[in-house]
Curated annotation (Swiss-Prot):
A motif (Effector region) lies at residues 43-51. This is Ras-related protein SEC4. The gene is SEC4. The keyword Cell membrane applies. It comes from Candida albicans (strain SC5314 / ATCC MYA-2876) (Yeast). It is found in: Cytoplasmic vesicle, Secretory vesicle membrane; Cell membrane. Involved in exocytosis. Maybe by regulating the binding and fusion of secretory vesicles with the cell surface. The GTP-bound form of SEC4 may interact with an effector, thereby stimulating its activity and leading to exocytotic fusion. SEC4 may be an upstream activator of the 19.5S SEC8/SEC15 particle. SEC4 probably interacts directly with SEC8; it could serve as the attachment site for the SEC8/SEC15 particle. One of its GO terms (cellular component) is extracellular vesicle. Its main location: membrane. Transmembrane segments: none annotated. GO terms for molecular function: GTP binding; GTPase activity. Belongs to the small GTPase superfamily. Rab family.
Amino acid sequence: MSGKGTSSRAYDMIMKLLLVGDSGVGKSCLLLRFVEDKFNPSFITTIGIDFKIRTIESKGKRIKLQVWDTAGQERFRTITTAYYRGAMGIVLIYDVTDSRSFENVENWFQTVTQHANEDAQIFLVGNKCDDEVNRQVSKEQGQELAAKLNVPFLEASAKSNENVDSIFYELASIIQEKHVEENIGGVGGASGAGGIDVSQNNSGAKNNCC
């Protein structure tokens, strides 16, 4: 998978993605690892909402991923739900070392389905899978919940960089396939929720990840 060194080329599509889940599950860490290939062990609470950009290649297309990192605290819930509109993909994250964050997944799923576009693709992620000593949620439990919710699932680790790229590449691929089905002309002309056909060069995208 290559998303490096070609930022001067035009991109074919923009995808707005949203990271949601309880506070402390590692949303910001996953995003930092994906975009900048860095890991910050310090817990820094997201205030409201933030976003980062990375451009990847998927199915022969240049996809500009605009990834929004939302606050997990209840007091920011009203603010962040406004950003669900237009999101083409939602990454719903829990912490495998925190059973409560896993128990809250279905509440988050309900919030997503209530506020996001009907065709938004949800992707379930169990973060911090490197910490087997403190694991409280098994991989099988995650798989069972994903099957119940009918969504794709991966365990990942921002710390060890396990499956971090895979989350976003797989989600982008699923969204592309949806748009191919909806737009016979291909994803380059997609104008649905968050999809933008552009002709100008994109020099600001961050591609410096492994």
